[in-house]
Curated annotation (Swiss-Prot):
Gene field: waaS
First and last residue of the signal peptide: none
Membrane-spanning residues: none
Protein name as catalogued: Lipopolysaccharide core biosynthesis protein WaaS
Entry keyword set: Lipopolysaccharide biosynthesis
Length: 311
């Protein structure tokens, strides 16, 4: 069985795939730009583009077998010629949700896949849907290479990285509270179409995932501000668990979950602001191996492979 990751291009995704290649027979295939360029041109004139998917399969996926697995994520499934590839290939097909999506998204894409894995566990009534935990891109064999001891910084360092997405006001307000309590801020809000106000925390471009890891490891506290309808765990939450950091978040679903501990999480909208200073200055214990494994790429890949072997 060969596992094909199709158009996974983010740097943290590539890091994960390289790790998984040590354990599984995996190929990472990216659609050449010329295919997407041609697809745009012929789509504008209403020309059928199924042939383009077949041509790509002939040149790049010609050796695929029916018991192999294609894995596509929600960020790319509706882009380029991915749908044409899925229509014209005979193998197991998986859609792996990494972001919050609506029911319409599921309905539009369900027929292209054998299984859709949902980390928020919101669509379990659909026969194509299976629950899976959100997963961290760094594997269990690699996490031990990082220093997970408490950072003895002269000032507690709070780290935020993410696109604006209309969150700048909340971030600015939190920054004021943290500064008042003596924290040093490493806040990086990437400008997007929602950015209308000026802020010293705005940056023009996203930083690399390796740099993100470096800053995360250097921090004492990570900040995670999510959309109102998001219920699953973000990458920031998983960073806090795997790198043994404290986390300030507005994700109320953390409270009462299996990952919750009062020493690790300060939940905006649940915890009193009066408790923030104590939280900042408290320590937190690392999670055990078995608890982390549930959110690892090792577990994710094992789950997917097992689901098809058992069929």
């Amino acid at each position: 069985m060969t596992i094909y990751f199709i158009n996974w291009v983010a740097d943290y995704e590539l890091k994960m795939i390289q790790y998984l290649k040590k354990k599984y027979k995996i190929k990472n295939i990216t659609t050449p730009k010329k295919y997407n360029w041609i697809n745009k041109k012929i789509s504008k004139i209403g020309m059928d583009n199924a042939w383009l998917g077949r041509l790509f399969i002939k040149h790049y996926l010609n050796d695929i077998k029916k018991d192999d697995i294609i894995i596509i994520n929600d960020s790319v499934v509706n882009k380029g010629i991915n749908k044409q590839i899925l229509k014209n290939i005979n193998c197991h097909k998986v859609l792996l949700l990494r972001n919050t999506v609506g029911e319409d998204f599921i309905l539009d894409n369900a027929n292209y896949f054998d299984i859709i894995y949902d980390f928020e566990h919101r669509f379990i009534g659909n026969e194509k849907i299976k629950a899976i935990e959100q997963f961290f891109p760094i594997g269990m064999d690699e996490i031990r290479n990082y220093s997970l001891s408490d950072k003895n910084n002269s000032q507690p360092i709070c780290f935020f990285l993410g696109r604006d997405k209309g969150r700048l006001q909340i971030i600015n307000e939190l920054a004021e509270r943290l500064t008042t309590l003596g924290c040093k801020l490493d806040f990086n809000v990437v400008k997007d179409k929602t950015s209308s106000t000026t802020s010293k925390y705005l940056i023009e471009k996203q930083i690399s995932y390796e740099e993100n890891i470096r800053r995360t490891l250097n921090a004492n506290i990570i900040v995670d501000i999510t959309k109102e309808n998001q219920s699953g765990w973000t990458l920031r939450i998983l960073e806090a668990l795997f790198f043994n950091k404290k986390l300030i978040t507005n994700n109320i679903n953390v409270f009462g979950s299996e990952i919750y501990s009062e020493s690790r999480f300060f939940i905006i909208g649940h915890d009193d602001w009066d408790k923030l200073e104590y939280f900042i200055n408290s320590s937190v214990k690392p999670m055990d191996y078995d608890s982390l494994y549930k959110f690892s790429p090792d577990k994710m890949m094992s789950t997917i492979v097992s689901d098809f072997i058992d069929k």
